[in-house]
Amino acid sequence: HIIAMAKIAKAQNKKVFIHVITDGRDVAPDCAAVYINQLLEVCDDDIKIATIAGRYYAMDRDNRWDRVKKSFDAIAYSHPSTSCDILTYLKESYDSGVFDEFIIPSSFDEYDGLKENDGIIFCNFRSDRMREMSSVFANKNFSEFETIKNILNLATMTQYDKNTPIDVLFPKDAPINTLAEVISNAGLSQLHTAETEKYAHVTFFFNGGIEEPMLNETRVLIPSPSVSTYD
């Protein structure tokens, strides 16, 4: 879908800069080159790969803003920057023992950061993992670190957070009669509890994409330990 979006934007006479987020958790830890090569096949003067970052940085969901900022800096300010191409950067990272999930954010030579009136499309459809990064650009009251406020258009593949003012390309159909809803309608009580890292799974996702607790639903959030990785 990223390639399709890039082609659509190019057809509208737009310059396209792709910001790659490497996975390494839901797939093999060192398979990013497979997908990057697919992107490179469509790259030309109008479509370029601008930055790279492992999901450890770009897809944090536990308020570790120091990580998010590293990815944001690469996207917004092209800092830091490397003179090598993306595949060389990836190989050098592997050679140093850093694999896809933890790829250190960097921009590439031909990218010079965001400019006034640029637009951003968030192509990730994993809502809980993109709330923090999207809020950096869209939330005018964001205060965790200095950001930029002059992005002309913002859009997401799906709704990440209904409180974040971003256009949604593909709104979700809300499921009905979820387990939490049935329990609540039966007049029973329920408890949803998890660590911060998985809190969205037992609340937002479990309740069919609804943020607010059901009637007689209690939620308990246990702060996840502040560690680099849970391995």
In which residue ranges do the predicted regions lie?
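Feature captures the catalytic ectodomains and active-site-proximal regions of enzymes
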Residues: H1-D231
